């Protein structure tokens, strides 16, 4: 009999939880709005990455041309600097990638 009371008590508590934790289901308009916001954020991030890539590519090409034509020592210093910064960039990219994998609620 003790198990039956416990079972009934748990069932009643579960019903209370179900009643209080009733999630709201968004309508089609809200879903479309959320989707358009996510697409806009994606486009903005993509554009930022493309601009950053082009800027970095131009800087690298300019520095390489300068190093090859003006001073080979500058080219060697540039290579050392890149090797020093590369682990930091890799760590930042891994951290950013892990942050994107987490589930965002809001």
Curated annotation (Swiss-Prot):
Keywords: Cell membrane, Membrane, Transmembrane, Transmembrane helix
InterPro entries from the UniProt entry: DUF5345
Principal subcellular localisation of the protein: membrane
Transmembrane segments: 46-68, 73-92
Record's subcellular location: Cell membrane
Name by which UniProt lists this protein: Uncharacterized protein YxlC
Species annotation: Bacillus subtilis (strain 168)
Domain of life: Bacteria
Pfam families linked to this entry: DUF5345
Regulation: induction: Expression is sigma Y-dependent. Induced upon nitrogen starvation.
Membrane topology reported for the UniProt record: Multi-pass membrane protein
Transmembrane recorded as keyword: yes
A single GO cellular-component term on record: plasma membrane
């Amino acid at each position: 009999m003790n198990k039956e009371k416990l079972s009934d008590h748990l069932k009643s508590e579960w019903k209370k939880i179900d009643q209080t934790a009733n999630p709201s289901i968004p309508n089609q308009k809200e879903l479309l709005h959320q989707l358009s916001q996510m697409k806009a954020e994606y486009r903005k991030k993509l554009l930022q990455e493309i601009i950053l890539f082009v800027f970095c590519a131009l800087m690298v090409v300019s520095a390489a041309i300068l190093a090859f034509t003006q001073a080979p020592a500058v080219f060697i210093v540039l290579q050392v600097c890149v090797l020093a910064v590369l682990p930091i960039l890799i760590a930042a990219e891994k951290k950013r990638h892990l942050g994107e994998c987490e589930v965002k609620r809001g």
